[in-house]
Design a protein with these regions (language model features):
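Walker B catalytic acidic pair
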Residues: 65
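Active-site-proximal or metal-binding-adjacent scaffold patches in catalytic folds
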Residues: 1-60, 69-103
Length: 103
């Protein structure tokens, strides 16, 4: 897991810099119902199981949480920004929900 964790840490840093997002801390946790979360203090938590997802879905989850550093809800503004960055946020989100279910 250490190798994958290093990759994901670098990926979060790379995507944050590329799109101009700032976050406070990054943690990996065991989460039963979510792939990630972003706190009011812009701490990003990623589910440890993210390592088993395809890279494009990893990027989507990371970007989803990075967008939450600016927009704390799932408003049209949120989906608009995420869609602008990912190209197809709603489609990727649907793919994630349908094919990779957390129990």
């Amino acid at each position: 897991f250490i190798h994958e964790e290093e990759y994901l840490i670098n990926r979060v840093e790379t995507l944050a810099k590329k799109y101009g997002f700032e976050y406070n801390k990054l943690k990996f946790k065991v989460m039963k119902t979510r792939w990630g979360s972003c706190t009011a203090k812009n701490n990003i938590n990623l589910n440890m199981l993210i390592i088993y997802l395809p890279k494009r879905l990893q990027d989507y989850i990371i970007l989803h949480e990075l967008v939450h550093t600016r927009i704390k809800d799932h408003s049209h503004r949120f989906w608009g920004l995420l869609g602008k960055i990912t190209g197809d946020a709603k489609g990727i989100h649907k793919d994630l929900k349908e094919k990779y279910i957390l129990i």
